Design a protein with these regions (language model features):
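Single-residue recognition of alpha-helix capping/boundary positions
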Residues: 31, 69-70, 237, 250
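Short proline/glycine-enriched turn/loop segments at secondary-structure junctions
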Residues: 161-164, 242-243
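Hydrophobic, often aromatic-rich secondary-structure segments at membrane interfaces
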Residues: 203-210, 214-264
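N-terminal glycine-rich anion-binding loops that anchor highly charged ligand groups
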Residues: 46-49
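Small-residue helix-packing and pore-constriction motifs in hydrophobic alpha-helices
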Residues: 1-44, 55-63, 71-84, 90-123, ...
């Protein structure tokens, strides 16, 4: 009886998932039958259930994506969900934040998941933790010119060094990078920091935050220049500079990143 109930429940969930896709897409019965067959085959190939596959597909159809885009994203999502041991719905939210903010079309969508998976295997943080941490600051990172490679490596480095969770570090990074974003808009931060003060602190150690055209440099370049000078600065200078750049609440994360620049 238990097996029968389980089978009935599975069939009911699958039917509901497929019906939701039909509602979102407006597909005909024949089109949905074709989709269900393809989903079943894809799910078997990815070692997951058809319902898990269709649930993930539904999320991407709700974003207004094409069949081809949904197929690619669903396959990547299921693969990463299997590695992370998480529900596809949760992983899809994380990957959507990453793709929407970092993907410029130059790399495959799977590349972004592969980077997280590799870092999860190489560090004390899990794939899921790194993805969750990235989700916290992906939007602001893209705005200030922090590349995906820098963002993921910085997150993994600071997480490993401080033993803080990727979620905590990701939230700290969001605040840290948002400072530069707010300053560029002409705001004065809560601690009294202005763009002039921020710029002067870095200028004092030989770093100009603007390029020859007067445009703000990408955060990748600013971090590169700071990392190259860090070990030659006194501890007092390091702390004072980190507090201006990152703020008094987040400066320890910046110090941890700079202290480990050689392995970053």
């Amino acid at each position: 009886m238990g097996a029968l109930q389980s089978a009935w429940g599975y069939a009911k969930d699958l039917d509901e998932s497929l019906n939701n896709i039909r509602i979102v897409t407006g597909y005909s019965s024949d089109k949905m039958a074709e989709f269900a067959d393809k989903a079943n085959k894809a799910a078997k190939a990815l070692n997951t259930t058809t319902t898990a596959y269709t649930d993930a597909s539904l999320i991407y159809y709700q974003q207004g994506l094409s069949d081809a885009e949904v197929l690619e994203r669903t396959n990547v999502t299921i693969k990463m969900a299997n590695v992370a041991g998480k529900a596809a719905a949760e992983v899809s939210d994380q990957l959507t934040a990453i793709w929407n903010n970092f993907d410029d079309g130059s790399k495959s969508l799977e590349y972004y998941a592969d980077v997280i998976t590799a870092l999860g295997a190489a560090t004390a943080s899990s794939t899921d933790e790194i993805a969750e941490g990235l989700e916290k600051f992906a939007a602001v990172a893209e705005t200030v010119g922090l590349s995906y490679e820098y963002a993921t490596a910085a997150l993994a480095t600071v997480t490993a060094e401080t033993r803080q969770s990727a979620d905590v570090v990701g939230t700290a990074f969001k605040t840290l990078f948002a400072r530069l974003q707010d300053l560029e808009l002409g705001e004065t931060l809560d601690d009294g920091t202005t763009l002039g003060k921020y710029s002067a602190a870095l200028n004092a150690v030989g770093i100009n935050i603007k390029d020859t055209n007067g445009e703000l440099k990408d955060m990748d370049q600013i971090l590169d220049e700071l990392g190259g000078k860090w070990e030659n600065l006194s501890k007092d200078t390091q702390v004072a500079l980190a507090q201006t750049v990152a703020g008094t609440r987040q400066y320890t994360q910046l110090v941890a990143l700079m202290d480990n620049w050689s392995v970053f």
